[in-house]
Each structure stands twice: as C-alpha cells, then as structure tokens.
C-alpha cells in the first residue's frame, strides 16, 4: 500500500507543477481543442 501512496503523491505533485507552469506562461497553442 505504501507504493500506492507514494505514486499518488508523485502524480499529484507533478500535476500541481504542470498546472502552475501552464497557467503562469500564456499557452501558445489555441486551447479550443480542450473542452
């Protein structure tokens, strides 16, 4: 079960960092494709 917890923490941390960078810099690609 520990591996599951560590994996969840890793994915959540990467997700937070990705969203932080994505919202910090203006997306150069039109986001109309993403609904």
Swiss-Prot record:
Q: Which UniProt keywords apply?
A: Chloroplast, Membrane, Photosynthesis, Photosystem II, Plastid, Thylakoid, Transmembrane, Transmembrane helix
Q: Which InterPro entries match?
A: PSII_PsbT, PSII_PsbT_sf
The record's Gene Ontology biological-process terms are: photosynthesis
Where in or outside the cell is it found?
Plastid, Chloroplast thylakoid membrane
TM annotation in the entry? 3-23
Look up the domain of life of the source.
Eukaryota
Question: What is this entry's stated membrane topology?
Answer: Single-pass membrane protein
Single GO cellular component term: chloroplast thylakoid membrane
- One Pfam family, short name: PsbT
According to its UniProt record, which protein family does this protein belong to? Belongs to the PsbT family.
Subunit organization: PSII is composed of 1 copy each of membrane proteins PsbA, PsbB, PsbC, PsbD, PsbE, PsbF, PsbH, PsbI, PsbJ, PsbK, PsbL, PsbM, PsbT, PsbY, PsbZ, Psb30/Ycf12, at least 3 peripheral proteins of the oxygen-evolving complex and a large number of cofactors. It forms dimeric complexes.
Entry-linked PANTHER family: PHOTOSYSTEM II REACTION CENTER PROTEIN T, PTHR36411
Q: What does it do?
A: Found at the monomer-monomer interface of the photosystem II (PS II) dimer, plays a role in assembly and dimerization of PSII. PSII is a light-driven water plastoquinone oxidoreductase, using light energy to abstract electrons from H(2)O, generating a proton gradient subsequently used for ATP formation.
Q: What is this protein called?
A: Photosystem II reaction center protein T
Could you tell me which species this protein originates from? Magnolia tripetala
């Amino acid at each position: 079960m520990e591996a599951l917890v560590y994996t969840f923490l890793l994915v959540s941390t990467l997700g937070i960092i990705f969203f932080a960078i994505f919202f910090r810099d203006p997306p150069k690609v039109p986001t109309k494709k993403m609904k």
